[in-house]
């Protein structure tokens, strides 16, 4: 009967319980563990939100360290799934970029876990409306569109 009551408690709890196989073992470095698909999707969401904020000129409201860490996770996955080894020039660039982003994350992360609360400053009413999209800026740009939006984000 304890089994059933335990299962009911687990199902009725508001936060889902993490499986034990995803938790890192104490004393081991988590950087050697490849990111799961769920972690990669979360990283992609963080980077996409950062790109949207940069497009709205709100990049000062983001945790840049968290975005850098998410970008490093995505680069690591691209390196592994693309089978770029450390001997190829592309693999070397990916390693350097990942190391830079991890260093940036460790030195600039606020540790708050989320973006700071928005300030109470009112937007100026005299801001002009954005110009209509050009023909070459239509949707379907893919990853290149996000790269263009986030171009000056980490500066």
Curated annotation (Swiss-Prot):
- Cite a single GO MF annotation: mRNA binding
Query: Where is it found, in Gene Ontology cellular component terms?
Result: chloroplast; chloroplast envelope; chloroplast stroma; cytosol; extracellular region; plasma membrane
Q: What is this protein called?
A: Nodulin-related protein 2
Cite the record's Low complexity compositional bias ranges: 120-130
Give me the ranges of the annotated region Disordered.
1-37, 85-155
Q: Which PANTHER family match?
A: EXPRESSED PROTEIN, NODULIN-RELATED PROTEIN 2
Q: Where is the composition biased (Basic and acidic residues)?
A: 95-106
One GO term of the biological process aspect: response to heat
Instruction: Tell me the residues on which N-acetylmethionine occurs.
Output: 1
């Amino acid at each position: 009967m304890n089994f059933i009551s335990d299962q009911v408690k687990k199902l009725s709890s508001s936060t889902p319980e993490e499986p034990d196989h995803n938790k890192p073992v104490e004393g081991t470095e988590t950087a050697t563990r490849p990111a799961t698909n769920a972690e990669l999707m979360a990283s992609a969401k963080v980077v996409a939100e950062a790109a949207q904020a940069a497009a709205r000129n709100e990049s000062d409201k983001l945790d840049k360290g968290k975005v850098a860490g998410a970008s490093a996770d995505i680069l690591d996955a691209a390196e592994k799934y693309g089978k770029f080894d450390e001997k190829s020039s592309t693999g070397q660039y990916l390693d350097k970029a990942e190391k830079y982003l991890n260093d940036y994350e460790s030195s600039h992360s606020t540790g708050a876990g989320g973006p700071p609360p928005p300030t109470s400053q009112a937007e100026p009413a005299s801001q002009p409306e954005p110009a209509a999209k050009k023909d070459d800026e239509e949707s379907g740009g893919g990853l290149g569109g996000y790269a263009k939006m986030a171009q000056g984000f980490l500066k």
